[in-house]
Amino acid sequence: MTSWEGGIITSYVNEFENLDGHGHGVKLEPTCNVPYTTFSLQSWRDGLDAKILALKYRHIGTYISLTRDRDTGRVYPDPVHGTPRIQYDMSDFDREHTLEGVIALTKICYVARATEIRAHLAGLAPFVARDGGKRQAEHQPGTDPEFTDPDFAAWIKRLRRADNKPPTAMCVSAHQMGSCRMSADEESGVVDMQGRVWGTSGLYVADASVFPSASGVNPMVTAMALADWISRGVAADLSS
């Protein structure tokens, strides 16, 4: 298996993308499996485990629970010297969604007959198929392995008890959005519907920071569309 080659997100599971009924949840995706991401995200156990894991690299697949978070952080000026500061702590609400996605991923790996499953949580040993994968081979489609394999069920129970709050859990934030959100009025955001900063002449923002909220998906096409829209407005303003 050469999972470090080819596209990084060629499929996804959207069954869990609306866990609260308001569009907040997770998508399950395969991700980039190059060495610096694969091994930097592993929970440290000991040197021997790290070396053995490196030897297994050709057999490793990496997956993520991509969370559309409900709760927000903030960007603010340092009160002393004005340097921009970032404050973001993942809320319990959003962490619960992330954990549900991780649990779903472990079940997908189980039915795909993975012989070892790691959840990137400090202190949580990996699930290892001690019977050589016999129970996985006997798994019936449409059944939940949490209720058919006692060993796997016990491991899932330990996973649910584990604290998935950083720094115990490895969380990665990518594609930051909405720090200069677009809004219909000055009280609700930073820029207007044309990307112009409220109350400032000649200043525009044209990237993912103008999203009204996190999109919950990789935002490249949306960011390009917004940049195209705003840049056309800039051209129109300059020519008028």
Per-region residue spans from a language model:
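A conserved FAD-binding loop/helix module that cradles the flavin
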Residues: 213-234
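FAD cofactor-binding and catalytic pocket of flavoenzymes
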Residues: 1-109, 116, 126-131, 136-138, ...
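A glycine-rich dinucleotide-binding beta-alpha-beta segment and adjacent secondary-structure elements
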Residues: 115-213, 220
